[in-house]
Amino acid sequence: MFQSPATASINGLLSDLNLKIEQVLLPLLSGVSRAVLLGFPNHQNVGDSAIWCGERRFLERHQVRILYTCDSGTPIHDVPQHLLNENTVILLHGGGNIGDLWSEPQEFREQIMTRYRSHYIIELPQSIHFSDEGNLNRFADIVRRCERYVLLARDEESLRVAREELGANAMLCPDMAFCLRALPRFAPPVKDIVWLLRRDKESVVNAPVHVLADDWTDDGLWLRYRMLRRILRVLNNYPRRLRYVRLITLRRIYDTIAWGRLLNGCRLLGQGRVVITDRLHGHIICLLMGMPHVILDNSYGKVSRFYQTWTYGSALTRLATTVEEARSRAAELLAAFQERRV
């Protein structure tokens, strides 16, 4: 379990988590100045955009140049071979999608690991969940064939699965969104409690009657991305100079979309004095914004596993097991918030 010497202070906790990320990742990137970052999250989940922005911030801070990026929907043959020689480090975007719950990123990961199994591949911090033993064993076979694959797990249980069941060279590392260090509140809160609850296959919580719960919503940015991607595919058929323009443009598009989604998420959460959420990055973004909040678990324990590994000492956070308990905990935080205002 992570021990922070300043757990009562949010700034101390965030500083300690950033230090831990550097202690784990910088030795793995020793001597590395160029890499590719694969698996951009082109969907509405703000948490994955927060991770992407944190990854990009970390790599910029430590002067690792990104030669190429793509999303997990990219056909494997579209990945440019001339950029992926055996001296190029492949970074796989982190998150919570190693397993059989979300098929697209897992299939993309397996294709990359199979095609480039002699390359140095670093899986940025992930949660792991397989519901089917056959799927787990199949992925374990891919991991064993991947000669220089390093898996960073973002909770203790994922680390156990990575080492004992996948046979991976694995290390424990916090979520890369913490590399953002802080996020803004754009305006004073307008309501006491914001409920941010999942509406997908990881959901196990129903919003209470008479409560209007939000989730990360479709922002329309993907439509602009789809149009631009068509233009960029045309450029790919032209000489190398235009292909270089394509790579630079695509990276900038990804960054713009990710930051747009993340800041929309900050605006949503910032409407409340207190947040109740079952999303892991509802929790992480609240910490980065300095907001009091209550967390509930998702379908397989991802949120509580992360909390118990890294953030259990946060004075801003309460863990609840039921909606009723979450409301009670939120009321306590709200009362404390109002006392500080007096």
What do these predicted ranges mean?
Residues 1-342:
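Active-site anion-handling motifs in enzyme catalytic cores
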